[in-house]
A protein has these predicted regions:
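Noncatalytic alpha-helical scaffold of FAD-dependent oxidoreductases
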Residues: 1-531
Length: 531
């Protein structure tokens, strides 16, 4: 049975809601003309493909007002937050964008999933000295990029993969190789429209309702659903000069990365990755159009002083990019690349440079996606691990990681690159490690598991291995996980550390009924089910 904008299903929900507080209202009084449909398979799936929790309904809102009616009705169905040991009386709601969560964070077992892609996705670009774009929370970043490029403009900070929603990345952080220079995406927002857990539609900014503004940025969907964002823009370069340079020493690799991020006046993008095997070298070169004549000897003894003690050699690759505006001097970007490359201590002559269109550079992971799809390795479980590590602990984490990786059959990239902590706004809800040096590294272990070789038990084993690795890194190195679903409230308390009390207070203020974000598992619900 398919239910569209019908009151039948709303009636069932309303009866359950209203009976919990001993009064009766008509469905239209409770919800108004809200579209609730039966759940589709996608509502209980995500990119991680390791968690599947089915809702009882899906909402495809046409506006922020639709979301507000739903959340307002749910939050008002009980007089206050659940007392210890008491059954909560409001259904849980999760916002789902492009479905790229890793651990069921956008799912709502027995509750309602709000499909934010249904929100208006128009991108309004405003030119001038303070150019910006007003975009819907359900718009994909690639849609934002395409609209802005038509005006010769673009946002400053990106994620590596562009087929993610604006509201989704702003609820987490949003990082890529530009973050050292401009900060994460959550540091590049002028204004938001948010529907709070109580159903209030609020326009907020650093000066207007700032507590809500900073709460939802990196807030893991706990305080509100982002329905619109205002993003600052810069002039977009036509081309990018893209460079890769190879290393056989982790110490030299990271030292050169930190040198690069100290030159924001010259360099526009810095990332890097580990070269574990032939497959990782081939897959990482899918989107890089230059011919790379690098033939690493993986069977050399690894004696780079990193302390790993591995019998097989690990190599590393730095990526950096320079914007090419092609104005008076067509060779200006080439001169910058030559200047910067001359300061690096890579394995000569293994540095490779290519010029690509700006859009193609930002959309580079799409090519890798197409390659993985062609091999049946895209719609598979992705037991990923993302960890922020203070720079003084980077070598230690690399050694911990290499103690858990079976390199011969490892499928997927391992990204490693530095971020500067002063580019993160401490008012936001996002968590990065304390780093006296001002530098943290993101380690992203991005596995794709072939179901023919790694079934359910194998995937569970990888997840457990990652859990142990993350726990040890947090305990020994002061690391913090990114995009993770912590296994317990105690783990979440440890994760937030000194900012835990602020996070809890924000929840009490903006979502006192604990309606939002059940998939994160931060604020447990005795029973979030409608049925």
């Amino acid at each position: 049975m398919e239910l569209t904008v019908l009151y039948l299903y709303a009636a069932a929900v309303a009866v359950l809601l209203c009976s919990s507080v001993d009064f009766i209202q008509s469905p239209s009084d409770v919800f108004g003309p809200v579209a609730l449909t039966e759940p589709t398979p996608s509502a209980s799936r995500d990119f991680g493909a390791v968690v599947s929790e089915a809702p009882v309904a899906v909402m495809r809102p046409g506006s922020a007002a639709d979301v507000a009616r739903l959340l307002g009705a749910l939050s008002s169905s009980s007089a206050g937050p659940p007392a210890p040991g008491r059954r909560p009386r409001a259904a849980a709601v999760a916002a789902r964008g492009a479905g790229h969560s890793l651990h069921g964070q956008a799912q709502a077992r027995g509750g309602i999933v709000v499909e934010t892609r249904a929100l208006p996705r128009a991108v309004e670009v405003v030119r001038g000295g303070g150019a910006y774009a007003d975009v819907g929370g359900g718009a994909l970043w690639v849609e934002v990029l395409e609209a802005c490029l038509r005006e010769g403009l673009a946002p400053r900070s990106w994620t590596d993969y562009l087929y993610l929603t604006v509201g989704g990345t702003l609820s987490n952080g949003g990082i890529s190789g530009q973050a050292f220079k401009h900060g994460p995406q959550i540091s590049n927002v002028l204004q938001l429209e948010v529907v709070t857990g109580t159903g209030e539609v609020v326009t907020c900014s650093p000066t207007q309702s700032p507590e809500l503004f900073f709460a939802v940025l990196g807030g893991l969907g706990q305080f509100g659903i982002i329905t619109r964002a205002r993003i600052p823009l810069q002039v977009a370069p036509p081309k990018v000069r893209w460079v890769r340079a190879f290393y056989d020493s982790f110490e030299t690799f990271t030292r050169d990365q930190e040198l690069l991020v100290s030159m924001p006046e010259l360099v526009d993008y810095v990332e890097g990755f580990m070269v574990l095997n032939e497959q990782s070298l081939r897959s990482s070169s899918v989107a890089f159009p230059a011919e790379v004549n690098f033939a690493p000897d993986f069977f050399r003894s690894d004696d780079d002083g990193g302390g790993g003690g591995s019998s097989k050699k690990v190599y590393y690759c730095i990526e950096f990019a320079v914007h090419d505006f092609q104005r008076q001097d067509d060779s200006a970007a080439d001169h910058v690349v030559e200047l910067v490359s001359g300061k690096l201590s890579y394995l000569r002559p293994h540095a490779y440079s290519v010029e690509v269109a700006y859009f193609d550079f930002l959309n580079r992971v799409r090519m890798e996606e197409e390659s993985l799809r062609s091999r049946g390795l895209w719609d598979v479980p992705h037991p990923w691990l993302n960890v922020f590590v203070p720079s003084h602990g980077a070598a230690g984490f690399k050694d911990l990681l290499m103690g858990t990786v079976t390199r011969g059959d490892f499928e997927g990239p391992v990204l490693v690159y530095p971020l500067l902590t002063d580019r993160w706004d401490g008012n936001s809800s996002a968590v990065v490690p304390a780093a006296p040096e001002g530098v943290v590294y993101i380690f992203s272990v991005l596995r794709s598991t072939d179901p023919a070789r790694c079934g359910g038990a194998c995937v569970e084993g990888i997840l457990e291995e990652h859990r142990r690795l993350a726990d040890e890194a947090c305990r020994r190195l002061g690391a913090k996980q990114y995009l993770a679903r912590q296994p317990s409230r105690a783990h979440w308390r440890d994760h937030f550390g000194p900012s835990w009390d602020r996070f809890v207070a924000r929840k009490a203020r903006f979502d006192p009924m604990h309606v939002l974000g059940p998939g994160q598992g931060i604020f447990p619900r005795a029973d979030s089910s409608l049925m």
